[in-house]
Amino acid sequence: MNEQLINRTMAFAGILQAIAQVQHLARHGELDNAELAASLNTILVTNPDNTADVYPDKIVLQKGYKLILNQLGDSSQKDVEITRYLVGVLALERKLVRSNSGLGMLAERINQVNRQLHHFAITDEQVVANLASIYSDIISNLGPKIQISGNPVCLQRPIVQHKIRALLLAAIRSAVLWRQLGGKRRHLVFARKAIVDTAKKSLTL
């Protein structure tokens, strides 16, 4: 398999994984802590030696690969809401990489969170709130806001709001990596089969 395509598909699985977690949280108000940690940790890996360093939890990433099969394959299980969130994330990522000040502030704020992790777990409410504020302060204002659908009772809870924003930041991080690896929106239309085949093979590794 083409190494670049493998890495690009891994990053795309990372985007979908984080988006699906946003959807689950918005509907149910709860998310497995290990899954949350796997996505949030990707934000902090800013200088990886390889793509696999960003996604060490292969079990969680498998869900992202399965979402690729559902969203890009011949499956009838395509989720319109996931597609809507994906379009929003990719649009915000484009705005971010064109904003030198945004990228600089992002790096600085991520360093602050890294220092926090000497004392707290990444899923600690204070850390999650700080990641959420990075999204609100730097990303959210770059373009149209992503409208999250779900259970109104869940969406009113501050901790759920914080986790959703932190996960959107994780999705943006994977989108930046996907683009750095040569990912383009047109690939999602014209190179779907290659992406789906790579996801299938990655699931069996």
Swiss-Prot record:
It comes from the Bacteria. Signal peptide: none annotated. It is a peripheral membrane protein. Keywords: Cell inner membrane, Cell membrane, Cytoplasm, Membrane. It is found in: Cytoplasm; Cell inner membrane. The keyword Ligase does not apply. Transmembrane segments: none annotated. It holds the Pfam family DUF489. GO terms for cellular component: cytoplasm; plasma membrane. Belongs to the HflD family. PANTHER family: HIGH FREQUENCY LYSOGENIZATION PROTEIN HFLD. HAMAP family: HflD_protein. This is High frequency lysogenization protein HflD homolog.
